[in-house]
């Protein structure tokens, strides 16, 4: 049908006869000559139709509506100098049409404009419902092509490094991995269910037991969890696993892989090694294990000085094993008013939404500190000097403080830090601050259930523990750090991985530590334990979020802008109306009966 696409055309094609296909982006009638911007997946080409080219042809052109699908045949001409459009690649050319065929009309008015000339800020719900039209606008198509380029660069690099791409099952066993599983009823096994995988974790470990050595997969994963801008119920993961490998070797290899992606897609070179930070350093200085290092405002520990001044809130925080921390906003006295940091203010609310009871503040004015009387009246000159030294605050700076449970203090000051950095435009948008976070704790305490939970997952290998330490194995595991590592970029986790447990008894003990009985271990993970008993090699790996990497490379705010057909924040597909009801006969085949609480 066509022998060229729009943006393939250049001055060397002048005088040639070509066939083009696409959509009418817009039609203009200027003094009897009809101009049409023809759009295809590559871009635009202006086509012209004159009355002298034939009455039938001209009448066809007169009735064309935007988004009509057409095929045109004509001669490529150079545009007059006064009509050159420098905004498109073919802006110096036009096609003088000799023949026009309408391939498809549009039946109804469009729900929103497609042409860049009529572009409007369409509501996302409408864009998701008519995703095929949203794709036609061009921006999303470019995003999908960039995504393809990223995956292509990954595949080429891994293929050249001796990796084998292997597909693992999508219908698998439900195992406790943190989020809820999506369950699939098994018709041939009454009352039993498959689960869609939250990750290929166990299968890739079994591939290492099988001797594959180097594996990767562009894997679909599924998690039934609450959604936000950078999460979807189904998402794409770059999954990597290697045998006979150390933590240092995994980090080094994957750093080169990521650098290669940025070079291939954005033509950006990173010559320096990515910096590293332990989990404890990240929590102490940023309040999060995903620190954004593009700006300052580090958290400072003031518990040693403020916990003893006699202010009740501070005293209780330290007595209860909590923390008193601060962040310093340079020139905050002029940029942030009291209204914003007091109850009802936007910054106060950010801290409150993160679980904090509130915020205390200190304004530095010369050598004096301005704050509420209950704090100020208990500060002497030594206190003031120490506070200024620890916080590195100067005249005109604002110090914000959080006190209480350490986790809540960290979480609230981290959120406030991010909020203020955006508000005061402290973030360099074009900066790529990669960071490896290492030495994660093996476990964290679930305070509600009073039990340990794996911080990453229960297959991470603990550091500096050997099976020979059997008498102290349980105690050592509970307090150990893991051979675990995350790659963070600009405050978002790109990927995470670990060395895996390859000894069956160590794996049993870790699963016991997270609260599983031996019977539960055998029921849920018996196949893995059995495999580890049959000569499993030391192995480890990592998984990267493809959607999130694409989002960051494109500079988008949501991964929905990187996925062809995403779900909304209620996990619904507005295009197909999924999930939906199914027929009674389908449910009967599965022996499922649905009851809905009134």
From Swiss-Prot:
Locations listed in the record: Cytoplasm
Entry's Gene Ontology cellular component terms: cytoplasm
Catalytic activity: tRNA(Asx) + L-aspartate + ATP = L-aspartyl-tRNA(Asx) + AMP + diphosphate
GO molecular function terms attached to this record: aspartate-tRNA ligase activity; aspartate-tRNA(Asn) ligase activity; ATP binding; nucleic acid binding
Annotated InterPro entries: Aa-tRNA-synt_II, aa-tRNA-synth_II, aa-tRNA-synth_II/BPL/LPL, Asp-tRNA-ligase_1, Asp-tRNA-ligase_1_N, Asp/Asn-tRNA-synth_IIb, AspRS_core, GAD-like_sf
Keywords for the protein's UniProt record, in alphabetical order: Aminoacyl-tRNA synthetase, ATP-binding, Cytoplasm, Ligase, Nucleotide-binding, Protein biosynthesis
E.C. designation(s): 6.1.1.23
Region (Aspartate): 201-204
Positions contributing to L-aspartate binding: 177, 223, 456, 500
Site (Important for tRNA non-discrimination): 30
Primary location: cytoplasm
A GO biological-process term: aspartyl-tRNA aminoacylation
Chain's role: Aspartyl-tRNA synthetase with relaxed tRNA specificity since it is able to aspartylate not only its cognate tRNA(Asp) but also tRNA(Asn). Reaction proceeds in two steps: L-aspartate is first activated by ATP to form Asp-AMP and then transferred to the acceptor end of tRNA(Asp/Asn).
Subunit structure and binding partners: Homodimer.
Name of the protein: Aspartate--tRNA(Asp/Asn) ligase
């Amino acid at each position: 049908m066509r022998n060229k696409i729009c943006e393939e055309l250049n001055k060397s094609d002048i005088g040639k006869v070509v066939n083009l296909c696409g959509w009418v982006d817009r039609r203009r009638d200027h003094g009897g000559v009809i101009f049409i911007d023809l759009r295809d997946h590559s871009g635009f080409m202006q086509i012209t139709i004159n009355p002298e080219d034939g009455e039938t042809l001209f009448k066809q052109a007169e009735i064309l509506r935007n988004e009509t699908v057409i095929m045109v045949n004509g001669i490529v001409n150079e545009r007059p100098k006064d009509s050159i459009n420098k905004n498109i690649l073919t802006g110096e050319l036009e096609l003088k049409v000799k023949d026009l065929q309408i391939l498809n009309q549009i039946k109804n008015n469009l729900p929103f404009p497609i042409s860049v000339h009529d572009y409007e800020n369409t509501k996302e719900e409408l864009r998701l419902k008519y995703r095929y039209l949203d794709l036609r606008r061009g921006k999303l198509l470019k995003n999908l092509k960039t995504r393809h380029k990223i995956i292509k660069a990954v595949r080429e690099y891994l293929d050249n490094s001796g990796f084998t791409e292997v597909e693992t099952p999508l219908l698998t066993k439900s195992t406790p991995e943190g989020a809820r599983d999506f369950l699939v009823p098994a018709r041939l096994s009454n009352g039993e269910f498959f689960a869609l995988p939250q990750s290929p974790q166990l299968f890739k470990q079994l591939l290492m037991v099988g001797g594959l050595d180097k594996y990767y997969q562009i894997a679909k994963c599924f998690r039934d969890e609450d959604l936000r801008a950078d999460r979807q119920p189904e998402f794409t993961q770059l999954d990597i696993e290697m045998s006979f490998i150390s933590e240092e070797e995994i980090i080094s290899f994957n750093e080169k892989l990521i650098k290669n992606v940025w070079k291939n897609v954005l033509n950006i070179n990173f010559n320096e090694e990515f910096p590293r930070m332990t989990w404890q350093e990240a929590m102490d200085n940023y309040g999060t294990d995903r620190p954004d290092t593009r700006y300052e405002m580090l958290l400072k520990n003031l518990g040693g000085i403020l916990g003893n001044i006699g202010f009740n809130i501070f005293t209780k925080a330290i007595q209860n094993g909590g923390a008193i921390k601060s962040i310093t906003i340079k020139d905050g006295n002029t940029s942030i008013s009291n209204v914003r940091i007091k109850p009802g203010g936007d910054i106060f609310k950010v801290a409150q939404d993160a679980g904090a009871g509130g915020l205390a503040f200190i304004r530095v004015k010369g050598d004096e500190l301005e704050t509420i009387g209950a704090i100020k009246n208990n500060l002497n000159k030594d206190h003031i000097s120490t506070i200024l030294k620890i916080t590195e605050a100067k005249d005109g700076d604002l110090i914000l403080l959080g006190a209480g449970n350490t986790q809540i203090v960290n979480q609230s000051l981290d959120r406030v830090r991010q909020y203020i950095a955006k508000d005061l435009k402290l973030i360099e948008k074009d900066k790529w601050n990669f960071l490896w976070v290492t030495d994660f704790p093996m476990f964290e305490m679930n305070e509600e259930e009073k039990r340990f939970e794996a911080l990453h997952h229960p297959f991470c290998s603990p550091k500096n523990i050997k099976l020979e330490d059997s008498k102290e194995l349980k105690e050592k595991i509970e307090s150990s750090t893991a051979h675990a590592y995350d790659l963070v970029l600009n405050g978002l986790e790109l990927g995470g991985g670990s060395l895996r447990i390859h000894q069956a008894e160590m794996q049993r003990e870790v699963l016991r530590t997270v609260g599983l009985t031996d019977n539960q271990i055998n029921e849920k993970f018996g196949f893995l334990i059995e495999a580890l008993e049959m000569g499993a090699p030391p192995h480890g790996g990592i998984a990267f979020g493809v959607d999130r990497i694409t989002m960051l490379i494109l500079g988008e705010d949501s991964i929905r802008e990187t996925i062809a057909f995403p779900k909304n924040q209620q996990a619904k597909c507005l295009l197909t109306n999924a999930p939906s009801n199914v027929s009674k006969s389908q449910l009967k085949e599965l022996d499922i009966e649905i009851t809905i609480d009134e």
